[in-house]
Amino acid sequence: MRDSRYDVLFEPVRIGPKVAPNRFYQVPHCAGSAGSEQPGFQSELRGMKAQGGWGVVCTEYCSIHPTSDDSPYVSARLWDDDDAANLSVMCDRIHDFGSLAGAELWHGGFQSKNSESRHVRIGPLQGPSDLYVGNYARYADAEDIVMIQGWYVDAAIRARQAGFDVVYVYAAHNELPTQFLSPFFNHRHDQYGGSFENRARFWRETLEKVKEAVGDDCAIATRLSVDTLQGGKTGYQVGDDGIRFVEHVDHLVDLWDLTIGSTSGAEWGNDAGPSRFLQENHEKDYVGQIKMHNHTDKPVVGVGRITNPDTMVEIIKSRQFDFIGAARPSIADPFLPKKIDEGRLDEIRECIGCNQCVASHHLGGATHIQCTQNATIGEEYRRGWHPEIFTPARNRDMSVLVLGAGPAGMEAAVVLGKRQMEAVHLREQNATLGGALNWITKLGYSDGADTGERWQNRGLAEWGRVTDYREIQLAKLSNVETHLNAPMTAADVLDYGAELVIIATGARYATDGTNAATHAPIPGVDTTLDWQATPPEIVTGTKTPGQRVLIYDCEDYFVGVSIAQMLASQGHDVTIATPHAVLAEHMNSTLEGGFMRRDLRRLGVRILTETTVEEVRPGAVITSDIWQPKATEEHQVDTVVMASARVSNDGVYRELRSRPDDLAEAGISGLYVVGSANAPGMIKDSVFQGHRLAREIDSEDPMDPLPFIRERRLWGRVDNSRYEAALDGLYAAEQAT
């Protein structure tokens, strides 16, 4: 049962003509390829949040017109009545659980890509986008402005038609209304430029027209970056135009959705802050000024990767917010509110702040939303997965051995346990659960010095929540046994007595420097030597680096740069080389890149991009420019760290697979391999693979993934029977539970 301390979180809150059932608010967030083109995906993704207790559930950004097309990134759309019909399925599903549905109306101005529509962009100025190369817009004159505001009204009416309860005018993150408000963009000399009142005019008039059109039936919200964090003449700050704008249009809105930052450069990361640089509730000093200092009496929602129920209570009681806003925490655990309500705090699957969900949006196109913690996100409709409901396996009378307790093995064991397999034994050769997470979570710690910024280097400790959640789940499952310090050979597996065997033994770094740039060993590389090392050896202290260190980073993500950050903070002279044009480019997609590069520069790390390691000699590394291979440079070093290719630890699996007769004699009817033991990948991939295999352990061949529903247009045929059957099965499982 709910602890009375948290009662305040479950109070209803009025938003204009609507009443939210509680204070949990899923703010607008992207979902990969959901949009309005895949109503099944969209409705079940958002509906799962409502079922999990989120009192308000919103779309992603929702385009109002073809002049605001973000392809290949996927937004929802309300261009016409067909879009409204598709999004009505989402509204109906949210309403099934008594929650409110919100639509975030969006026009990107000159930030729009228009790659699909090919329409000419339109904005407050004729000038280039600071975000996308080659994006220019035509100047919006007075007639254009009236036309654009009409598009907002048309979309708002369609939103009401679809069944939305809350209708946004989205402006935060440098969208069109902010392009008018911010002096960084707005250099106009007419009634829409110059003074604050003129710069605010477009946004104010748009709110007036939307409110007049649908305000009697729908709550009117607007999303504002109270501080663009650009300062001076390049943006605005909370102490000037941020507060002033709230007071200027407060009478027109029913709810304020407050955030910070922009999309210029890496500044979106100041809002969707990665955990290694920004802590929980990191926006408080900015967004907290609005309600706490009485600049509005309207309900306020805000975010900050808030996962701790006690922090939530403090936020409400201090009047920082009226709603606990969440994007990433609601992705990691759609049932977070219900778990608080039912007193199951230890079962909350906390967001780790890795921002793989954000990266899945940046990949664009058909990419589904992905989460390291929650393998079921985005799979609610197409695979029929529910994050809290697991059907008993048809072969549940069988015993299962899971070898390896890294992310894939832990997840597989948890899901198998919840599917009521008779006996699941999880065996791990080390003394702790977690696999590679045991050294990854120690990465990146800096010197503790003040960076001079609002962010600090905090390391990857919060990624340990992947292990923490699964360790708690394993302890609750009586049909799952965990055995640590329990290495196994192929012979041990054959003698163990299990009927199904899952190998999840992870991966290791290549010792010869094999890498993605050359797909071959590097002359002179041998990390078994004392003066050469792999990343885990540095982090765990197995090897002690010398003063001069060169890191060769071929992974393009967090490992190489984190080693550089850690060693530089300890006083080492660090050079990091990468064959890629941008150092750790995937970190741009996770919004960590800007923070990381700032910190590496602060620490004095030398960065060499588009550089390959040609040869390693005692005391020296020879590098070359990838475009001019003959242009080599010799670096004097004491230690070389190779963040190169990884190799699966699949020896036990391959030996067992080569002995089919012995498997049959041992009574092993199924042998499977998952995670990095199958193919090295990211943590999210290992968790997903372990989950999928366990979900499908009773299929004909669990190694061959079952087909999933593909929402698509079929020429000359409209047949929803398969989709409807899938939903019937999902709903039946919910009712049975």
State where each predicted segment sits.
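Short beta-alpha connecting loops at secondary-structure transitions
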Residues: 270-276, 322, 438, 443-458, ...
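Short acidic loop-to-helix transition motifs that present clustered carboxylates
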Residues: 307-309, 331, 487-490, 538-540, ...
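Flavin-dependent oxidoreductase catalytic cores
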Residues: 1-403, 407, 411-418, 451, ...
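Terminal amphipathic helices with adjacent charged low-complexity linkers/tails
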Residues: 196, 434-437, 441, 500-507
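N-terminal Rossmann-like dinucleotide/flavin-binding domain of flavoprotein oxidoreductases
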Residues: 437-498, 587-614, 619-620, 634
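Rossmann-like dinucleotide/flavin-binding elements
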Residues: 394-430, 483-494, 504-588, 627-639, ...
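Flexible inter-domain linker/hinge segments
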Residues: 351-352, 370-396, 703-737
